[in-house]
Amino acid sequence: MKWCNFFNKISLILQALGCAVLYFVIEAICRHSFTEAWTYMTTRPLVFAYNAAFIFTTMLIVYLFRKRIFWRIFVGSLWLFLGIVNGVLLLNRVTPFTGPDVKNLTDGLSIAKKYLTHTQMTIGAVLLGIAVLILLIILIRSPKYRGKLKYKVNIPLVLVGVLAFGGITQLALEKRVLSNYFGNIAIAYEDYGYPYCLATTIFNTGISAPRDYSKSEIKRIEKSEENLPETKEGSHPNILFLQLESFFDPTLVNYLELSEDPIPNFRKLMKEYSSGYYKVPSVGAGTANTEFESITGMSLHYFGPGEYPYKSILKETTCESAPYVLKNLGYTAHAVHNNEANFYGRRSIFPNLGFDTFTSAEYMKDENQKNPLGWTKDSVLTDEIVKCLDSTEGPDYVYTISVQGHGDYPSEPVLENPEITVSGAPTDELNNKWEYYVNQIHEMDDFVKELTDKLADYPEDVVLVMYGDHLPTMGLTVEDVENKYLFQTEYVMWDNFGLKKKKENLAAYQMAAEVMDRVGIHEGNVFKYHQARRNTKNYQVDLETLQYDLLYGKQYTYDGENPFERTKMRMGIYDTTLDSIQVVSETDHTYYIQGTNFTPSSQVKINGEWYDTVYVNPTKLIITGKELDDF
């Protein structure tokens, strides 16, 4: 009894120590290493202490109950469960467990199927069941606090603890112990700790209402655009954007030595056409966010830390974008991506951005042309882009997202005879990563030449903007790169009709407006804003207000009603047709399927049943295993 009284008196201290140990275990799980967790704790002690205090604060509710041991174990188990979920996810993807994932937990089974085998799911379900059973036993058999529960004291003290932690959070942000801007969400989780980053991505989302937000303020912003000229009449050129995965100039890395220039074609184009640095919202990851800025003209800076609008607001509403704006001028909007359609949820998001067609890897006949990591090579994109241009009589807007340069880059040699060799990195493992990466972007550079050569002879006017979406995941620091800035790649604005060359650095959210301005198009609220207000006073402040109004506010810009309807987007450019079925072998029920526009992803379903399908070529498939009675 004396021991119980003693432990009750020092329960806060014991709880704090327990939370620190629990947090260390969580970080070890997330980092897949106790050594890395120890390094993190010893090199960033203030961040570690803050996150341990976060868990401690959530555990203060135990003082409102008698079964305090149970509630400590229950709250601790929830944190441990979240840590395990993140650890498992990071075994299968680069992005950690974030707010949007929490909101999708109701679809937990489908998420589990995506990342776990059937056996792993079974083991996980059994372990979860055992954990729940243990918690129930603890609930029934754990001792109760025998003293008097003083709610009039305990509740205010818990609230004081929560408020004090809020003050600590604000102080940590002011002193830059923490940050509320995540350039790379994976690195942010490593730098600022799992509890803080998870909570931030859950609660700090969207764009906060500006203090002076009102209808009159929006009208004032609109009035500042009045001096823009009208959109020129007549025909308009095809507008193409080519977003190159992790593409940047490795000669800018101070320590690298390369056997030859890996991007001679891109470099040549930069000298001959408009070019400059391209400011992007993230480092090492975040393709979809560079994409969002380039398509909509909106800056990610005003959204929540690490937020992906593709996973938040764009699931709920349409958004003003280049496809919607150009549609009013007769453009057809196409998206092209040599990866699966559901990557970043693009298949469901692109209709909310106004795209008319989406050609993903599943709709490409050459999707099986893979690099050593299994990503489809970018060379397959040339024909797909030209197909988009050929499919309509009027002008086209084509947004292409490449994938060949995607990581995670191998630390062991995987190329037998690399065309370009690399040295100078601090370790052999990093040299191997750079050598693999450099040879991939060298092939991407060849693709750039192939595409521009093909478009040079195209019978319609074309302007093509090419740029890297972010720097590669190589652990680069500002000291490592010649330009001393990690949030930028380079772009070139190529054309086949003689646009004047211009050297200018631009942000991703400014590029679409710049292209439209260069070809005489002055449409769209966001794009006109950039054209009229860039480099003027309060440019960023008013941009934040405008973005808030369009996505989260009362939409004064549209007189209170969003004018953009979700498009009925089709997958692929041309229909897939089935023309005939021929018997190959009656003994094992093998048949030829004749048709058009088949790809390696084609699957045959007849009368509600799926058949084993083998791709032969774009006009022929083989199905087998089941007898067809009537065809």
Residue spans of the language-model regions?
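Residue-level preference for non-acidic, small/hydrophobic
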Residues: 108, 239-244
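Solvent-exposed soluble domains appended to multi-pass membrane proteins
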Residues: 228-234, 244, 249-622, 627-631
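Membrane-interface micro-motifs in multi-pass membrane enzymes
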Residues: 47, 99, 185-198, 284-285, ...
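Short secondary-structure junctions and interdomain/linker hinges
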Residues: 68, 88, 115-122, 142, ...
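Transmembrane and membrane-interface helices of multi-pass
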Residues: 2-188
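Membrane-interface segments at or immediately adjacent to transmembrane helices
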Residues: 169-241
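N-terminal post-signal-peptidase region of extra-cytosolic proteins
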Residues: 118-119, 224-226, 317
